[in-house]
């Protein structure tokens, strides 16, 4: 019913002056990622793997970025908080998390070819105690008005590519 994608975030004042993905590989940049045991952490590593194979961000990009990682956090909110507070120069988070922190962080887009899109399904449970209400919720979320609400919060709507 909705999808999410990765973005790189920097503190709002962006003291490291990061403007493009290549800047993450500069020596001395402090990066935080989520631990690989959580989906966003694995997706961040997938992005680096794709960038390494693609080559468009430069040879040795993955190793250079990983050398700049100062911590692996247990969840995406911790990554976002460390960046927003200026404890790190950059982090990789979901676009939906960055959207709700507008003003606290800046975003650097990750191209589709290097990104991983998380897909969230929706369904009513067969043993739901209120199947009619569950269906009404699904109908709303999948309708244009519901999709607009989700897009406002940084998600990719079901009909968008």
Question: For the regions a protein language model found, what residue spans apply to each?
Answer:
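Exported/periplasmic ABC-transporter solute-binding proteins
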Residues: 2-161
